[in-house]
């Protein structure tokens, strides 16, 4: 009899209702500890409003309509909430930077949600505290609707790490009526594999998009993010596990250009933090993060998922909601590569080079020239160069070349060859991610390290 079900305990708060430690909130395999969330007054959730009228200084608003009415909040704008994760705070630079970027491209109520009173705790405690924060956000959204007639479909919640699951809880409590939730590397421990009630899932909003950047297992790799698909669209940049630029050595990372605190954060959780950096970059680069529908990153890297399907490719990040098929299915997976430093956007091209001239061993490189700019030289092939053979590769250019007007070909082999062989490209075909094809031709051959320009055939 003693082994019977133990009645769970619960805590209740007047505005927000009751929180129990019953299953699935606690006492399940993924969350064995029976822990209750802290009180709303301890967590002290705050809403920091940035607007086009005051882009650099926030106004503190609450779910009381008088504070909203006396602020720069406008009901004819979308409202985007940005929610930080574990140990973080609402005044951290990245949240304000995200608002700043949003205010450059749109008229918006941008609200940074600060819950540092609940995020700076033992991790298992923080995972319970998010339930109260989610309830606070839902209460705020409900107040906007009941007091100002503001529709939840105009609300977009962007959450990083634990903040993704705060967004999920707020969405669940508003019955999935919120317009959009974006999960930026949703936290894995205590959430991966749990029932949908506990974590972010596609029923939490009309549209849910997710960026996965740190999907390695928490043990032993310390991957903080979920590898599980939890949205309508799930993006896996660079495969979703190891982000380029995150493998720097410890000292260079900590004494980073952004100062000790940013550097230390980047060292401890570089992959995990990349998700919000990609999102911020995407706001100002509407075409720079095309995601390709694919079964896996290996398949994508083997050049098997190009170009975009007839409906186009969704853009990872801010403009994911422009994708026509966004809610056709759940858990649609998309892959792409990004840059490794400040400018993360990339544009993918397929290049097919048909060689002419002598048979040699060497490297073939091509650069693209177009209405939007000029790309670097990208290696298309290295090995035995056979005239009449076509070599195909895909590149990720840091420049959106636009309509391609000409291409330049160069080859080298670094072996002294007294016969001075000449190699050329009789044709180069470039395919853009929208499927548009550009063809270029040349009759000439060149010695190594000499540029050959090909013009439209």
Swiss-Prot record:
It is found in: Secreted. Glycans are attached at residue 343. Residues 1-7 form the signal peptide. Ca(2+) binds at residues 196, 199, 201, 204. Residues 347-457 form the PLAT domain. Its main location: secreted. Inhibited by bile salts, is reactivated by (pro)colipase/CLPS. It is an enzyme of class 3 (hydrolase). Disulfide bonds join 12-18, 99-110, 246-270, 294-305, 308-313, 441-457. CDD domains: Pancreat_lipase_like, PLAT_PL. Its EC number is 3.1.1.3. InterPro entries: AB_hydrolase_fold (IPR029058), Lipase (IPR013818), Lipase_LIPH (IPR016272), Lipase_N (IPR033906), Lipase_panc (IPR002331), PLAT/LH2_dom (IPR001024), PLAT/LH2_dom_sf (IPR036392), TAG_lipase (IPR000734). Forms a 1:1 stoichiometric complex with (pro)colipase/CLPS. Belongs to the AB hydrolase superfamily. Lipase family. This is Pancreatic triacylglycerol lipase. It comes from Myocastor coypus. The lineage of its organism: Eukaryota, Metazoa, Chordata, Craniata, Vertebrata.
